[in-house]
């Protein structure tokens, strides 16, 4: 019963925070639509400030209501005046609060590439739209074979989003697995990794091609939860999550990673894929080490 009450209290406070701050965020987002040039940049900065304040209050709510220990590592030299590409393993909706706890007001506010269906999430869908989060429509290979005219649509969205990102410092978050990890998915994929699904290099390659010269570094984020199963969001709300490890390794980005054409150059494509696969091998080993803690 105590956990239920804790969950209800935490959820209520988070909802109240959302209701209070989504209004100002959307007002400034509308200013972005009508103001030109520097006016738009100032409005965009105001949107980011509201989002960061929203996130800081969410952090305070979790600290007040839940006993979760956020074990955050590798944040000592992060900066807010530069741009980053962040990659992370993906297991649960709790990954989002984990990124907020570790990156908010330590780096530029982060942007995700979201599934198009998420724009319909009450309140949050509007907030994500106001924050210029790109909404992607994912098509299966079989569907694209029947509708070849849709091939490359996500690339167009990625390029358009990255053009917006060039106007100010940004942290672009990319989940290379493309979906949340489960053991069933790992076995279905026949993934060679113990704790990860196979990575997809295409999305990160397009971000590098569009923003490479603007990016200061790669943030290699590894999130580990206690136990054999990742917690759900309700588990976080009701205080069932005792500890979350967020390990951040800052890596240099080789300019060669955006020096070619990923779509048309098979040699360059193999180079990027090999780089991603090596990152994933090291991340898999890192997860194993952190789980033993």
Predicted regions: what they are:
Residues 1-84, 90-92, 98:
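Membrane-anchoring hydrophobic helices of lipid-metabolizing enzymes
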Residues 12-15, 259-293:
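Accessory terminal regions of nucleic-acid processing enzymes
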Residues 96, 158-159, 200-204:
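Conserved glycosyltransferase catalytic-site signature
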Residues 37-42, 46-54, 80, 84-147:
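Catalytic core of membrane glycerolipid acyltransferases/transacylases, capturing the structured
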């Amino acid at each position: 019963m105590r956990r239920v009450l804790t969950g209800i209290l935490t959820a209520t406070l988070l909802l109240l925070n959302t209701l209070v701050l989504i209004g100002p965020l959307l007002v400034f987002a509308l200013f972005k639509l009508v103001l030109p040039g520097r006016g738009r940049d100032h409005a965009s900065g105001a949107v980011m400030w509201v989002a960061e304040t929203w996130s800081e209050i969410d952090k305070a709510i979790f600290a007040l209501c839940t006993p979760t220990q956020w074990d955050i590592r590798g944040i000592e030299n992060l900066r807010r005046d530069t741009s980053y590409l962040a990659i992370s393993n993906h297991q649960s909706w709790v990954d989002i609060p984990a990124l907020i706890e570790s990156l908010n007001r330590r780096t530029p506010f982060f942007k995700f590439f979201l599934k198009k269906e998420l724009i319909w999430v009450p309140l949050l869908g509007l907030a994500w739209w106001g924050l210029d989060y790109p909404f992607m429509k994912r098509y299966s290979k079989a569907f694209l074979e029947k509708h070849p005219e849709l091939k490359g649509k996500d690339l167009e969205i990625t390029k358009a989003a990255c053009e917006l990102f060039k106007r100010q410092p940004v942290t672009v978050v990319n989940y290379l697995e493309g979906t949340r990890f489960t053991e069933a998915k790992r076995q279905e994929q026949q993934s060679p990794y113990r704790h990860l699904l196979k990575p997809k290099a295409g999305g990160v390659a397009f971000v590098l091609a569009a923003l490479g010269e603007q990016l200061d570094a790669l943030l290699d984020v590894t999130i580990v939860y206690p136990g054999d199963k990742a917690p759900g969001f309700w588990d976080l709300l009701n205080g069932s999550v005792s500890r979350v490890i967020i390990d951040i390794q800052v890596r240099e980005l080789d300019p060669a990673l955006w020096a070619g054409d990923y779509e048309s150059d098979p040699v360059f494509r193999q180079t990027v894929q090999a780089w991603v696969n090596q990152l994933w091998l090291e991340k898999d080993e890192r997860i194993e080490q952190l789980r033993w803690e």
